[in-house]
Design a protein with these regions (language model features):
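A glycine-rich helix N-cap at a beta->alpha junction
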Residues: 84-110, 116-117, 124-127
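N-terminal catalytic cores of NTP/NDP-binding nucleotidyl/phosphoryl-transfer enzymes
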Residues: 10-22, 26-89, 206-237
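Conserved short loop/turn motifs at secondary-structure junctions
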Residues: 38-42, 71-79, 101-111, 134, ...
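Core subunits and conserved enzymes of cellular information-processing
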Residues: 240-244, 248-250, 311-314, 318-321, ...
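N-terminal acidic, proline/glycine-rich, low-complexity intrinsically disordered segments
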Residues: 1-6
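Active-site cores that bind ATP or allylic diphosphates and position pyrophosphate for catalysis
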Residues: 70, 74-76, 82, 119-279, ...
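Long, charged, mostly alpha-helical binding arms that flank functional sites
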Residues: 258-337
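Intrinsically disordered or highly flexible coil/loop and linker segments, enriched in small
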Residues: 30-31, 97, 126, 173, ...
Length: 562
């Protein structure tokens, strides 16, 4: 399901990439902007990819006639899967963006990229190298020492063309030969030290079958795919800044139809989570999370399952902006953006997470009174709903304290509280079981209090009619990690030791307002936070609810006390 894309940012909020794009249009360098989002289909997209998606598709939306391509970088068939292709398309659509007819794959261009390789060989700008991968790596040198020329660097173009043809024909085993660009083994830029641009991989490809047993590297395929598609601005994260000279060199030395401009921006890093695809895969494979879409994961599918909204994520990506400086962003900013979005749109219901029975001693036997409450106070047009009120209620255990501490204003023996949308009740009796655990409160209600304002100091608490409440399992999620930055840990420490053992709290005795279970999307339980039904485990008659986000930033408050 797709969602409407956001409006273009206001002019005063232009980032440096948008300024470049606008200047290129003003100067006539380009009549339109053409960008691309080029994921590798070897994993699920995460919130960091959402930033790139919003930037690339956003640029196209902001300029009439412009477009953004979705291109799968499918140059490594051993690690790719159709599952990831489908999930990536679903995620991009869900975020509110559409590539229209501009869906491409790097494999669409394998023939043309191969022709470019032949062109480089014929010009004496690339050569077939017989060094094993480990030796290629060892002879690259260091940041302070030049690399060593391969003994195969002096092969003639004719010999290289013959060997490359035999590589394609499958004569040589995997890893035995590579095609390398002939640039400069003494370059201060390690990426220009005769990089590998083709390697032998006898692995069938999902789209091309057994046609190829040699595949271009990312650097080889990336720039040429951009050029063949007429991309104007090839936007990458900062780790590709050092690759830009190679990007330009490869395009400059063949008959490419155009030369896109590569621009780099800082990638998104969030506190208390991980963005590394390798680490996310480790969590999934070790069973440390409930799959790629675990609501604690930063994957888009995980955020969707948790109840985050596309507009909230887009708002967050716009708010953090686009810069050239790497930094780590507070997870609280993402939660705040989602919270702000949900406050405008989410319907309100009542739910009790840890129920405690309250019996109203003077309530007429069998009487059910419908009470009216707003569906969403932030949206007057949303209307109202009816909540049944009876003499046997469920309240939150936390809303009662037998021996109240200073500053506690909710129910206690002899104390009165206002029931939300309802009446004042007073606790007169406390019923306990044999272990001394409080199992029931009893007391009268004030029938005249329904339409009066609570007295100063009277707390307002939520409740449910015991006879009408529906049992549900509720899952409360918290930070995935206990440390802000999983990379900032002592050497030799297993990063998974920073996983938060309290990141999931499953409450099996919760009860909820029935209407909440028929509400699509994310909703608010008043006083508790925003919740949604779990798309993976919730079943008819056995609802499972996920807490999307609290009503306030309780994590920051808790950390301030540490």
């Amino acid at each position: 399901m797709s969602h409407p894309a956001p409006e273009a940012p206001a002019a005063e909020s232009l980032d440096f990439i948008r300024e470049i794009a606008q200047e290129d249009l003003r100067s006539g360098k380009h009549p339109v902007i053409v960008t691309r989002f080029p994921p590798e289909p070897n994993g699920y997209l995460h919130i960091g990819h959402a930033k790139s998606i919003c930037l690339n598709f956003g640029l196209a939306l902001e300029h009439p006639g412009s477009r953004c391509h979705l291109r799968f970088d499918d140059t490594n068939p051993a690690k790719e899967d159709i599952e990831y292709v489908e999930s990536i398309q679903e995620d991009v659509h869900w975020l509110g963006f559409d590539w229209g007819t501009h869906l491409f794959h790097a494999s669409d261009y394998f023939d043309q990229i191969h022709d470019f390789a032949l062109e480089l060989i014929a010009k004496g700008l690339s050569y077939v190298c017989d060094l094993p991968v480990e030796e290629v790596r060892a002879t690259r040198g260091t940041l302070t020492e030049p690399g060593t020329n391969s003994p195969y660097r002096t092969r003639t173009p004719e010999e290289n063309l013959d060997l490359f043809a035999r590589m394609r024909a499958g004569e040589f085993p995997d890893g035995s030969r590579t095609l390398r660009a002939k640039i400069d083994m003494a370059s201060p830029n390690m990426n220009l030290r005769d990089p590998v641009i083709y390697r032998i991989k006898k692995v069938p490809h999902d789209r091309t079958g057994d046609k190829w047993c040699i595949y271009p590297t990312y650097d080889m395929a990336h720039g040429y795919s951009d050029a063949l598609e007429g991309i104007t601005h090839s936007i990458c994260t900062l780790e590709f800044e050092a690759h830009r000279p190679l990007y330009d060199w490869l395009i400059d030395h063949v008959s490419a139809p155009c030369h896109p401009r590569q621009i780099e921006f800082s990638r998104l890093n969030l506190t208390y989570t991980v963005m590394s695809k390798r680490k996310l895969l480790e969590l999934v494979e070790k069973g440390l999370v409930d799959g790629w879409d675990d609501p604690r994961m930063p994957t888009i599918s995980g955020l969707r399952r948790r109840g985050y909204t596309p507009s909230g994520i887009r708002s967050f990506c716009h708010h953090i902006g686009v810069t050239k400086y790497n930094s780590i962003t507070d997870m609280g900013l993402l939660e705040a953006a989602v919270r702000e979005d949900l406050n405008k749109t989410a319907p309100r219901f009542l739910g009790v997470l840890r129920p405690l029975k309250f019996t109203i001693t003077n309530w007429p036997a069998g009487q059910i009174e419908p009470l009216e409450a707003a569906i969403n106070p932030a949206d007057p047009e949303s209307g109202t709903r009816q909540i049944p009120f009876t003499g046997e209620l469920l309240i939150e255990q936390d809303d009662f304290m037998e021996e109240p501490t200073p500053g506690y204003f909710r129910l206690a023996p002899g104390r009165t509280a206002r029931l939300r949308h309802g009446y004042n009740v007073t606790c007169e009796d406390v019923i306990k079981d044999d272990t001394g655990r409080v199992i029931e409160l009893r007391g009268p209600y004030d029938p005249e209090s329904r339409h009066s304002k609570p007295k100063k100091g009277t707390a307002v608490i939520h409740w449910l009619s015991a006879a009408h409440a529906v049992p549900a399992e509720v899952r409360l999620y918290d930070r995935l990690l206990t440390v802000p930055d999983p990379n900032d840990i002592p050497d030799g420490t297993d990063w998974t030791s920073t996983l938060n053992p309290e990141s999931l709290d499953i409450l099996g005795q919760a009860h909820v307002e029935p209407a909440a279970l028929t509400s699509p999307g994310t909703f608010q339980f008043e006083r508790l936070g925003y919740f949604c039904q779990d798309s993976k485990h919730s079943q008819p008659g056995k609802p499972v609810l996920n807490r999307t986000v609290t009503l306030k930033d309780t994590w920051a408050k808790a950390q301030a006390k540490v």
